[in-house]
Amino acid sequence: TEGITLADIQETIGGLAPLPGARGFLDRLREQTQVIILSDTFEQFATPLMRQLGWPTIFCNELFTDAAGYIGSYRLRQSDGKRKAVVGLRSLGFDVTAVGDSYNDLTMIETADSGALFRPPRSIVEEYPTLPSFTEYDGLLHFLTVDTRADPAL
């Protein structure tokens, strides 16, 4: 897109607001557990929204600009990065619960110890009827914070 700098794009993104209730949801969730956002976006696009969300940890891709601020190239951290991040966290002994809303989240959700959908398109709900699906933050928060698994140490 000629004539548009990264700063121009960030200014536009900075005018967007997170979904109503998103900040409160993340704040309540972070009181009870660690949260990592895995995204296919770019750090530079995510920054304005992450600021509004209280700077949650986000793993995503990266853009590179030239001296004039125009996007020159990008770096995708790795293919299927969401799934690979879950594999890595599980290999470190973490129980991982993944939540997504689109087809590109399914390998991550299926690789996690547990997973759910949040406000997905109807087509995904119909194709994956065994995945819990939520439309409201309170239901998702309950799913994420009520541990139904028995403690293996007991």
Task: Briefly describe each language-model feature range.
Residues I13-G14, L19-L154:
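C-terminal cap/substrate-recognition subdomain and adjoining C-terminal extension
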Residues T1-I4, D8:
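N-terminal helical cap/lid subdomain that shapes the substrate entry/recognition surface
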